[in-house]
Amino acid sequence: MCRPASRACNVSIVGGNTKTRIDSGIRWATWAPPCIEDGRDVVLIEPSVLAMFRLDYRRLLADAEGQLLFERLRDHSFDAVEYLWAFMQGTGLDAAKLFPASRHPLGTRLFYHSHCQQKTVGSAPATEILLRAAGFDVATSNVECCGMAGSFGYKKEYYDLSMAVGQDLFQQVAEAESGGPRVLVATGTSCHEQLASGLKRQVFYPTELLAALLPQLEG
């Protein structure tokens, strides 16, 4: 395992678009090439960070050397569940045996909301596919934004607007539960927080839900 020296990817400050902030974000990425050249991939759990590696660094790393760095990051960076599903397909692992939905204590009916950045970079389908393959009954949202929009909804002056935008998502949850309750699953910190605070419900990350289904090994 190759871990970055920095604890933060600076995705929030890169969004500020000042030279100092952009340089800070670029410096963070320099840890990755040695890891990638050593045959490793970059596995991420936050969609906004994945979007930086697959899209944003093309703009930020403008020179020829920077473009090579961007291409390596783009081609070797994956959402955690996307990476897991690709590995399972390549090795023939059976999702229904490895992650049997019947093992989940809250039932097999899920409502899954994917992060907007997942949709942008194309990593969203893998989670839904894996969950269905495991035996879950998955209802999905089709809203573009949960209303949180990164750090937007955390700001006091935008809270009411954030909640108003989120009503479409909350309504879709209610409609999906017309036949009975569903376990809420969301990718990304902001979407997770919006659903949890807006509906006053427990919300699972996909990786968290899948981890709970693994058999407990006796050590």
List each language-model region with its residue ranges.
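Iron-sulfur cluster-binding electron-transfer modules in prokaryotic oxidoreductases
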Residues: 1-219
